[in-house]
From Swiss-Prot:
Blocks voltage-gated sodium channels (Nav). Causes tail erection, scratching and a reduction in mobility at a dose level of 1.40 mg/mouse. InterPro entries: Huwentoxin-1. Belongs to the neurotoxin 10 (Hwtx-1) family. 60 (Tx2-9) subfamily. The presence of a 'disulfide through disulfide knot' structurally defines this protein as a knottin. It comes from Phoneutria nigriventer (Brazilian armed spider). The keyword Secreted applies. This is U5-ctenitoxin-Pn1a.
Amino acid sequence: SFCIPFKPCKSDENCCKKFKCKTTGIVKLCRW
């Protein structure tokens, strides 16, 4: 599937392989 960086997530599994689910402000986003 196509990788969407900085998409909302609940856990690392929701992100691409190279991304981690990190809290940014009040939301969690897939980030490096």
